[in-house]
Amino acid sequence: MARRPILLGDQLVLEEDSDETYVPSEQEILDFARVIGIDPIKEPELMWLAREGIEAPLPKGWKPCQNITGDLYYFNFDTGQSIWDHPCDEHYRKLVIQERERWSAPGAIKKKDKKKKKEKKNKKDKETSKSPLVLGSPLALVQAPLWGLAPLRGLGDAPPSALRGSQSVSLGSSADSGHLGEPTLPPQGLKAAACAKGLLASVHEGKNALSLLTLGEETNEEDEEESDNQSVRSSSELLKNLHLDLGALGGNFEYEESPRTSQPDKKDVSLDSDADRPPTPGKLFSQGADSSVASANGSKSQGRGASPWNPQKENENSDPKASSSQMAPELDPGGDQPSRASKKQQAEDPVQAGKEGECRRESAAKEPKEASALENTSDVSEESEIHGHLKDARHSGSEASGPKSFLGLDLGFRSRISEHLLDGDTLSPVLGGGHWEAQGLDQEEQDDSKSSIAEPQSKHTQGSEREHLQSSLHSQATEEGPLQTLEGQPEWKEAEGPGKDSVASPAPLSLLQREQVLSPPASPERAEEKHSQAEELGLEQPEAEETEEKVAVCPSSPVSPEVQTAEPAAPQKLFSEAILKGMELEEDQRLLLEFQKEKPQQLEERLWEEEEEEVCQLYQQKEKSLSLLKAQLQKATAEEKEKEEETKIREEESRRLVCLRAQVQSRTEAFENQIRTEQQAALQRLREEAETLQKAERASLEQKSRRALEQLREQLEAEERSAQAALRAEKEAEKEAALLQLREQLEGERKEAVAGLEKKHSAELEQLCSSLEAKHQEVISSLQKKIEGAQQKEEAQLQESLGWAEQRAHQKVHQVTEYEQELSSLLRDKRQEVEREHERKMDKMKEEHWQEMADARERYEAEERKQRADLLGHLTGELERLRRAHERELESMRQEQDQQLEDLRRRHRDHERKLQDLEVELSSRTKDVKARLAQLNVQEENIRKEKQLLLDAQRQAALEREEATATHQHLEEAKKEHTHLLETKQQLRRTIDDLRVRRVELESQVDLLQAQSQRLQKHLSSLEAEVQRKQDVLKEMAAEMNASPHPEPGLHIEDLRKSLDTNKNQEVSSSLSLSKEEIDLSMESVRQFLSAEGVAVRNAKEFLVRQTRSMRRRQTALKAAQQHWRHELASAQEVDEDLPGTEVLGNMRKNLNEETRHLDEMKSAMRKGHDLLKKKEEKLIQLESSLQEEVSDEDTLKGSSIKKVTFDLSDMDDLSSESLESSPVLHITPTPTSADPNKIHYLSSSLQRISSELNGVLNVLGSLNSQPPPQGLGSQPPPPLFTSSLRSSKNVLDPAYSSQAKLSSLSSITPMSTQWAWDPGQGTKLTSSSSSQTVDDFLLEKWRKYFPSGIPLLSGSPPPPENKLGYVSVSEQLHFLQRSHPRVPRTDGVSIQSLIDSNRKWLEHFRNDPKVQLFSSAPKATTTSNLSNLLQLGLDENNRLNVFHY
């Protein structure tokens, strides 16, 4: 079943492969019948549905698929629906229900009523007929006139008979679809003439077309909208070029259908042995090889919107060679072939038709199916048109209009057997069913006329018979009024068709008369049929008379073997009576023709107007729905375009920002240059103004000095005159001395006045220059501030616009997703509604179809093979003529195209000529531009020369300014002297102010020192009380140590006594030193905790920075993937066909949404991590500040005395118990720190809580970062996270520990914490440090001396916890520390010797352990003599331990 499988994800998509040789077994048919609800035993009449459904192919869009478990299911790639059962099963279940209901409905009552109504009208026919004919009775040999073919003409000139002929052909194509499972019909006499072969061919085609009628309609429903425009163009344009005018082929081609379709037939087992089941696919192909002729005829009515789509149209367009090959064996241009040749052809036709059917089926499976132009309109308007056409049909009195209109509909179903003809749209109105019947009748009449009757006589009898029959039928029609249609013939909407369908093509009256003679007297329906035939003949008689060519119709063999044996015994009397009656009917026929010429034209116009209005309405509705869908799609595409435009806008904004920055920078540079030029100009103006001011002031000073000198001279001269006059009498010596003194005094005063004036003038000039410079600096600073503010504002606005654009883009993305969901739901609802409407119409059409086919299912099977050869002969002739016409049209089109090509070339030459003119004009313009550029260069050179002249003038002005400055140097010297005096005065004032401020500060310091001394006194009293308490503890411990077995102390306390203090004071001093050491150790541990937490915070910051970078990379990758997905989605929407890549696009979209969700979670987690880090830093700062306050308070209490302790050191192997027993002297309960323990505990707990929350956040970040990104999105794995260590001060402050145990625990804690903080899982590497830095460093140095191979760790401590992210939370570290720090028992419970032995064993084990190499870089003891020296410990002024060598 499957070939060329396609793998989509984990699903395997298979392809359906039809096997022509496959024949289902009876067991398979029975099983499938039970599946669709048929009981094979009780309902054998419904088994044909099971045989048909088991071979039904998959509808379009459905494909079989196989999942990973091997189960098969069916998936619709158009709607996305998936089911387990075959898609056709449910459809055939509904058909079974409809057939069952139709069988249960009563159907015989209507037939009886119709027979009663028609008994009175057909009494004359009963009298004329001598004996009723039964099945197998002999047939009369009568002649029929020959009719010719009308010339070819366009679609606009087609008479009503052309459309009528096309509809009559469709009866054969749909006549025998329901021939199985129908109730038994009453017996009926055979007609006078043989049934047409063409009708039989169309009957078998109807079987093939209707065997899968519902399946074809259901599967191709969605293809109809896509192929509307193509079918409209192909059918309408080609039909205008080529079609057959069947009105001239004989109007009697249809009238014989009416009695055969209106009278119910009895099922004949001898004629149809397969009546209980439908033919197998082989039979369908063999019987329906020529069905393309019938199905192609529906295109004319489709062009008018009268029927649904034609299932044969696409295939006729696709393969003209196959159609010509199918028609070749059926053509028989020879008109006088014997009946044996037709019998021989009957045997050959099934084989040849079977082969042709296989070819057609293969080509139909490969070629795409195209729907006709008016499928959508005909489905909607079908119900509204049925009743209107049927009313017109009743007025015309045509009982046979039901099946003929049914043919025009062509049922709207698409057959699975695709027939191919040469451009089938051009052959749409080929031969009608009535034409086939006429050919068969004419053939028999020609055989009879060879012996007795001449051809002109037959024409004469034909005319008289036609007139007589029409007059009688017209009188019957006026009496009867509107007639009812027979049961089994559904009231189709297309029953009468457009006006052309309500009338039939003209038929020869001789055939009507023969039909009247040969009809049995017991049939009550013959009168109605003849009446309808007469109307059809009368309406189309003018069309037949216009034809000038007479073409001989090929004779055909009799209907069946029974008919052949019965022909020689037929009486000749019947024919003579028919001739007499025909002569009587000629006058009546003329009146009937005149009456009926006007009636069909009015009816036709009215019907066409109604149909056009309905078609326009439906077309408008369709256009509206399509426009709505297009608008929605355009909105979606517009939103996607807006997204792309937003991205483009962002890029443009970034470019614009860069351009703005460059512009701002260039503007600032230009502005600075401008400011510089303005400053230079302003300075130049100031200098010039200062020079003018100096000149003016100098002139004024000189004038003032001259005036003062003149005044002084005048005063002196007056005084001298008065003095001379007064002292003239006195001594001349005194006068001269006094004059000398006065002159000297006046000269000094004059000099002082001149100096004072000059100093005052210089000060004023200096103030003026400084004020101008200050104003200039203020102007420059204000301008710079404005420039910076403008730049900041522009950058802020650009940032705001970028943020707004990003926010709008996110909103648009959300809106697009919601819109896509709404659009998909809307389309799904619309598709379901259309499917329901279509199923409802299909069910109604099927019911009517089955009723119509019940009467005509077993009539034309035997006659089909005989008529096929004759019809194919005529068809080949027509095809040749069509080909010639087509070639002529192609030649004319080719000439027109050559002419158009020549015109295009001529226009192209004109364009080239114009372009050359434009090039010449362009070259002239370029020359003008070059000339203008040369002029501009000359002008630029002139401007450059003028600039040079200006520069020379500026240089000259600068030289003049320098000369002016040289003249003012002596004035500046005088200014300097004046300023020096002023500065000395200001310095004295500043010194006085500084002394006052210093005095205030000293007073405040005195107050602070007094308060501090009070606080220190209080603290000293508390320390004395603590010392007293610890002395008591020391006494108790000394008593216990005296009771121990090894009394030799290793610690010489006598060496500490430098004064004559008592033992009590010595113990107090030692306890004080130990308590301070413990306090230092606790403080140092807290400091180490703070440093470790600081390292952890830095590591956390680095980790967050790395996570931010990785998140940005993932965001960029996500944006690129989204753009790629949008591009793929747009390209997939542009393609009309359904692609399998839509599922991949859907998966990609899900992955993109999941990636955006992960990135949002990472953003929130990183934001929370930043907040926690800030809180942790604040807590650490608070803890550090509290510790600093504590240390500052303790430093004030430290003394300057140095306390020393000596140790008698020996080799490590010779450590005696006596030296170790002195250690309990150092085992003193430490004093708690002076810091507030509640505050420290609160800060520690808050730090622990923050660290635990930070641990959770970082774990979330690591898990998010470790998730694999979707297609195309890559992110690096999270880097190893930071680690943190927590060393609580309470571990150091625990009382009752021995000094050795404390030292060992401290030494084990310190490397463990450093190991966690820096290098997890690889051991600790501590660098050596100076022993004078901290207490911890000193202790580490001592432990290196005692343990050269490294500091011993706790033997039972587990390894540090490992984390896949590298991060260790504070709670886990505390838990690990609690587990790794075993409580060392007190010395009063365990002996010192056992402790020494255990330590030795541990040291040996630690040395031999190759895995632990902790302090490989620690210095080892070089010689044992250094250890034997005396060492002394002492405290310096900073309260630090130092080692003194002796």
UniProtKB/Swiss-Prot annotation:
Modified residues (Phosphoserine): 202, 1369, 1371
Biased composition (Pro residues): 1267-1281
Coiled coil location: 1143-1197
Composition bias, Polar residues: 164-176, 288-312, 451-461
Location of region: Disordered: 106-132, 159-185, 217-238, 250-408, 424-570, 830-849, 1261-1287
Gene3D superfamilies: Photosystem I PsaD, reaction center subunit II
Cellular component terms per the entry's GO annotation: 9+2 motile cilium; apical part of cell; centriole; ciliary transition fiber; cilium; cytoplasm; glial cell projection; nucleus
Residue intervals of the WW domain: 56-89
Compositional bias of kind Basic residues: 109-121
Keyword tags: Cell cycle, Cell division, Cilium biogenesis/degradation, Coiled coil, Cytoplasm, Cytoskeleton, DNA damage, DNA repair, Mitosis, Nucleus, Phosphoprotein
Location(s) in or outside the cell: Cytoplasm, Cytoskeleton, Microtubule organizing center, Centrosome, Centriole; Nucleus
One of the GO biological process terms: DNA repair
Keyword Coiled coil: yes
Nucleus found in the keyword field: yes
SMART domains named among the record's database cross-references: WW
Region (Interaction with ATRIP), start-end ranges: 1-195
Chief site of localization: cytoplasm
Biased composition (Basic and acidic residues): 257-277, 355-372, 384-397, 490-499, 525-534
PROSITE patterns according to UniProt: WW_DOMAIN_2
Acidic residues bias spans: 218-228
Role this protein plays: Plays a role in microtubule organization and/or maintenance for the formation of primary cilia (PC), a microtubule-based structure that protrudes from the surface of epithelial cells. Plays a critical role in G2/M checkpoint and nuclear divisions. A key player in the DNA damage-activated ATR/ATM signaling cascade since it is required for the proper phosphorylation of H2AX, RPA, CHEK2 and CHEK1. Plays a critical role in chromosome segregation, acting as a mediator required for the maintenance of genomic stability through modulation of MDC1, RPA and CHEK1.
Quaternary data: Interacts (via N-terminus) with ATRIP. Interacts with ATM, ATR and MDC1. Interacts with XPA (via N-terminus) upon UV irradiation. Interacts with CEP83, CCDC92, TTBK2, DVL3, NPHP3 and weakly with NPHP4. Interacts with DZIP1.
Protein name as catalogued: Centrosomal protein of 164 kDa
UniProt organism field: Mus musculus (Mouse)
